[in-house]
Amino acid sequence: TKNYAKKIKNQYIEHLSLNKSINKKSVKILSDYFDHIFDLGESLFKSIIKLYNKDITSSKEVFKRLKTLSTLRFNYYANQTRPVEVSKQDGVALGCETHVDSGIFTILYQDKKGGLQVQNRKNKKWYNVPFNKKALVVNTGRALEFLTKGKFKATNHRVLWNKKKRMSIPFFFEPSYDFRMSKSFLNGSNSKNDGLIYEKFLNQSLKKFIEYQR
C-alpha cells in the first residue's frame, strides 16, 4: 500500500498514482482493505503454524511486509460471447480455466453472479461456491501445499461460463519474494535455507498456467 511503498525502493514494489484516477477517499478505502485482508491472511497462516507447534512469530519470516508479493486484484469480466475452454473432464463450458493458485491463500470476494466451482480431490466432482455477501472464500495455494508437504492441498477451481459481465476481487496472499521455500520451515526443528526463493518458485508455478503455454 502507499505508506509501505514509500519506504523502500525495490523492483518488486509498485505503487500506482491512484490519486490521478480516483478520489482520495477511494484510495484510502482500497489501502485500508489491503491492510485488513493482509492481516487476515497472516492470521490464517498463524493458525496453521500452531498445528506444527511452532512459534507464530515465525510468520514474520515469511511475510515481510515490504517484500511480500501479495496482490489485490479487481478482475472485471466483460460479456463473454464464447467460453475460454470446454472442460475435457465433463464437457462444461468455462469462463476461466481449471487451475490452482500459486501462493499461500487466495481470499476472494465474488459478486452475485457467482460461477466459482471447487473440486473434491477424492471423487473429482465439482461443487458450486454460493455467493454470500457476508463471507469471503479462501482457497489454499500451491505454496501452502509445498510448505506443508501436501497436508493442505492446493484448491483446484474453475469458473463457469456466463454471458453476463461480472467482477471478482481476489487477494493473493503470498510470501516475500526472497523467502526460502524450505519444507523444513514447518516440518523441521529449524528453518533451513535450502530451498528456492519464492520469486523463483512463483515463476515455475506460473509456467504451469494455460495462459503461459499458449
For the regions a language model picked out, list residue spans one by one.
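Peripheral, non-catalytic segments flanking oxidoreductase cores
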Residues: 1-214
